[in-house]
Design a protein with these regions (language model features):
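Active-site nucleotide/adenylate-binding loops and adjacent lid/helix of ATP-dependent enzymes
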Residues: 1-61, 82-83
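Peripheral (often C-terminal) accessory segments that flank ATP-dependent C-N-forming ligase machineries
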Residues: 177-262
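Oxyanion-binding "anion nests"
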Residues: 101-105, 112-137
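Glycine-enriched catalytic-core subsegment of oxygenase/oxidase enzymes
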Residues: 166-173, 179
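Glycine-rich phosphate/pyrophosphate-binding beta-alpha loops
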Residues: 96-99, 103-107, 154-168
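Flexible, glycine/charged-enriched surface loops at secondary-structure junctions
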Residues: 61, 134-136, 185-191
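Phosphate-binding site of ATP-dependent enzymes
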Residues: 38-100, 113-121, 141, 147-149
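Conserved metal-phosphate-binding beta-hairpin within the catalytic cores
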Residues: 127-162
């Protein structure tokens, strides 16, 4: 019945209301993923029937699929002080997402960007609603309309928010200055381009589909969340090597080009 009442056509994107909630992580059903992409009503119903046979009783979020690949996404991180004034904004252009079932939709690599018009619009919105704290805003550029479609606002920094540090912005320092010391400076608007990545360079070279982006990334040394030159304990280096090696296997097995498949 839900599929028949959708205000948009297939393809669609479907995800649990909280894919990190214990009731979803602990349930098991065939084809379980963090996020689903469906071309047809039949594909969607097959998943729902499978899910209904599990212990999951939460809600599902259904969204229209906006055409475009990973690089059409945008993520905006900001910090609003205790008075509701935005103090920092950093825009990122994801160039690659994860595709394995447990991580699909999470960003694997991001180029930090600047966009004055978008900063202005989102700053006015956040201040108008009296938002306080960190915000992690996911959106996608819709080439059909020339506008951004805002998906969600997360009230925390995301796992990929280290791209802000690559651009030179320390969100945690801003929080400390505000809450602990009561210091509030002018709003910082990032305009620096820098590369953050949580996967090896070889994966970016192979799976980033835009030739222009692949060429642009060659200009930047990637900042990696997991790598720390001051902590080269053999056990840690070994675990990192295993993690990076596993990414080659995961992408080879699960990757698909959204811009072509949909």
């Amino acid at each position: 019945e839900v599929a028949d009442r959708l205000p948009f056509d297939f393809p669609i994107v479907v995800k649990p209301e909280n894919s990190n909630a214990l009731d979803y992580l602990r349930c098991h059903f065939e084809g379980q993923k963090k996020v689903f992409f469906f071309d047809t009503r039949e594909e969607y119903l097959t998943m729902v029937r499978s899910m209904n046979g599990s212990d999951y009783r939460g809600k599902l979020i259904l969204q229209e699929f906006i055409p475009g690949g990973d690089d059409a996404m945008r993520v905006l991180n900001s910090y609003s002080d205790t008075d509701g004034t935005v103090r920092a904004m950093c825009l990122g252009q994801p160039v690659l997402e994860y595709y394995d079932p447990k991580s699909v939709g999470n960003y694997a690599a991001i180029l930090s960007r600047g966009d004055t018009l978008l900063y202005d619009k989102m700053q006015r919105f956040l201040q108008a609603i009296g938002y306080v704290g960190f915000s992690n805003i996911d959106m996608k550029y819709d080439s059909r309309t020339g506008r951004y479609v805002l998906f969600e606002i997360n009230p925390r920094l995301g796992r990929s928010s280290f791209f802000c540090r690559a651009a030179g912005i320390n969100m945690m320092k801003l929080l400390t200055e505000d809450v602990v010391y009561g210091r509030r400076g002018k709003c910082i608007y990032n305009e620096t381009t820098a590369l953050w990545s949580n996967v090896p360079r070889g994966i970016l070279t192979r799976y980033v589909t835009s030739p222009a982006l692949r060429e642009e990334m060659k200009q930047y040394k990637a900042l990696h969340t997991l790598w720390c030159g001051g902590d080269l304990a053999p056990a840690r280096v070994y675990r990192l090597a295993r993690y990076y090696a596993a990414q080659y296997k995961n992408f080879a097995r699960y990757y698909f080009d959204k811009s072509k498949e949909k």
